[in-house]
């Protein structure tokens, strides 16, 4: 898929993911975060393919990608998937952690999900991501917050 083929919703989702990892709001992310972002978005890929593409797109070898470069790179890995099917998969994943069926999961469960998606995340990175998602500090994440985090919607 090319950047031109991305829907407005996909670009918004990727912007949200990019911003989540651009913690200092410098306008770029480090190339080592790309695989984490792709996994968070539920994309599968060969690590070697990703590294080769990063080398191509990060031509100056700075290890930093601006949003347009990130968009070019991630567009190649995005699989066109029915939005409803993706939402259903996420709903199912949420239900697995919402053991009591009360409509929310503790942030500790969210931490497990994020760690499962990328085992290279540090405790500080996990804390920052959870703080961004659990904006009211309740220690829980409801399905809407979970969906917003996972899809940018």
From Swiss-Prot:
GO MF annotation list: calcium ion binding
Keyword Calcium: yes
UniProt similarity note: Belongs to the troponin C family.
CDD domains in alphabetical order: EFh
Main function: Troponin is the central regulatory protein of striated muscle contraction. Tn consists of three components: Tn-I which is the inhibitor of actomyosin ATPase, Tn-T which contains the binding site for tropomyosin and Tn-C. The binding of calcium to Tn-C abolishes the inhibitory action of Tn on actin filaments.
GO cellular component, as recorded: myosin II complex
Sites where the protein binds Ca(2+) 2: 134, 136, 138, 140, 145
Gene3D superfamilies: EF-hand
SMART domains named in the record: EFh
Biological source species: Tyrophagus putrescentiae (Mold mite)
Protein's recorded name: Troponin C
Signal sequence region: none
Segments forming domain EF-hand: 9-44, 45-80, 85-120, 121-153
Alphabetic keyword roster: Allergen, Calcium, Metal-binding, Muscle protein, Repeat
Residues binding Ca(2+) 1: 58, 60, 62, 64, 69
């Amino acid at each position: 898929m090319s950047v031109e083929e991305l829907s407005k919703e996909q670009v918004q989702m990727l912007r949200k993911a990019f911003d989540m990892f651009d913690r200092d709001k410098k306008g770029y992310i480090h190339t080592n975060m790309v695989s984490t972002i792709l996994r968070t978005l539920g994309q599968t890929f060969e690590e070697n393919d990703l590294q080769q593409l990063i080398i191509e797109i990060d031509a100056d070898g700075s290890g930093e990608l601006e949003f347009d470069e990130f968009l070019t790179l991630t567009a190649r890995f995005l699989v066109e998937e029915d939005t409803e099917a993706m939402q259903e998969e996420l709903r199912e994943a949420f239900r697995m952690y919402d053991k009591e069926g009360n409509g929310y999961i503790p942030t500790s469960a969210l931490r497990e999900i994020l760690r499962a998606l990328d085992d290279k995340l540090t405790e500080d990175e996990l804390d920052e991501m959870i703080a961004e998602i659990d904006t009211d500090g309740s220690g829980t994440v409801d399905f809407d917050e979970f969906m917003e985090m996972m899809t940018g919607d």
